[in-house]
A protein has these predicted regions:
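Oxidoreductase cofactor-interface core, primarily capturing Rossmann-like NAD(P)-dependent enzymes
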Residues: 2-49, 56-65, 69-71, 80-89, ...
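A hydrophobic C-terminal alpha-helical subdomain
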Residues: 3, 16, 36, 192, ...
Length: 292
């Protein structure tokens, strides 16, 4: 990032997560004042004179209020869980009460759905729209890292699902984080402005095409086995995955991939960053070690 940070304190909720950790790193490297918020208790000292960390207890209203107090911008990037909507709404309400000027919410490529976590994100977005605070909504396509979550299945020749044959335009989590960081450092994510940003990769690939790229990257044949939703559910449950995770994975397959909802391409990442987003083959090449 080339900007020199001039805004006030940025509080980052979900600071140890896949997106949040990269945001914290980017802001800290640019000299921004950052407060990293995490459920994991930690010392108040972190690397960087303008960066601190703080434990946040989402069951304690006082802890939430203290976490956002004094911040100009609040980044919300929590992981998917049954408590996600409650926790993020509590953060938003605390931010409004504390006088935080702007929320950067890492959401999802959303459409009306009962599928988790899309319905949770929509609930949070609806609440955010009704309170008096500026916001930047980052709505990314499914992350490329969803392939990495299948690493054990790929290693054991069990990879497959109900994703169908349409291309999925997955996005690298680093691009999502880089967009958030650039918006904050440039001042675009500040004050009362309210704007969504729809984020995708540079172009989609089908699961069969992704399998071909995996094969080239690791030097052995990888196949994607097409299954019905019921067959995929039975397999995942037999492997001991929790019901919620099984539901998330099946929902992505059926509602995001097979439906064609993940085929779109936007120019938003390049417009914000001045460079194209990382491609799925790029991610596979960098992450090949996960699948060997």
């Amino acid at each position: 990032m080339n900007e020199v940070a001039t805004q006030g304190l940025v509080a980052v909720a979900g600071a140890t997560g896949r997106v949040g950790s990269v945001i914290v790193e980017g802001l800290s490297d640019a000299g921004a004042a950052v407060r990293s918020l995490s459920r994991t208790p930690s010392d108040p000292d972190t690397a960087g004179a303008r960066s601190t960390s703080r434990h946040i207890d989402y069951a304690d209203a006082g802890s939430i209020a203290s976490a956002v107090d004094g911040a100009s911008v609040l980044v919300i990037s929590l992981g998917s869980s049954d408590d996600q909507a409650r926790q993020e709404i509590a953060l938003i309400d605390a931010a409004v009460h504390a006088g935080v000027e702007h929320v950067v919410k890492v959401s999802s490529w959303a459409w009306p759905s009962r599928m988790h976590p899309i319905d949770w994100h929509l609930q949070i977005e609806d609440h955010l729209s009704k309170v008096d605070i500026g916001y930047s909504l980052l709505r990314p396509m499914t992350f490329s890292a969803v392939i990495g979550a299948q690493a054990n299945l790929i290693k054991n020749d069990l990879w497959g699902g109900a994703a169908g044959t349409l291309p999925a335009n997955l996005i690298d989590v680093r691009d999502v984080a880089d967009v958030a960081t650039r918006l904050i450092l440039s001042g675009a994510a500040s004050g009362p402005v309210r704007r969504p940003y729809h984020l995708t990769g540079p172009g989609g690939l089908s699961m069969d095409a992704i399998a071909e790229h995996l094969s080239l990257a690791i030097g052995r044949t990888v196949k994607y086995t097409h299954r019905t939703p019921d067959e995929q559910r039975a397999l995942l449950l037999s492997l001991g995955l929790p019901d919620m995770i099984v539901g998330l994975l099946l929902g992505i397959d059926v509602e995001a991939f097979a439906s064609g909802a993940s085929t779109e391409t936007t120019s938003t990442v390049e417009a914000v960053l001045g460079r194209p987003p990382r491609s799925i083959p790029d991610w596979i090449t960098e992450s090949a070690g996960l699948f060997r």
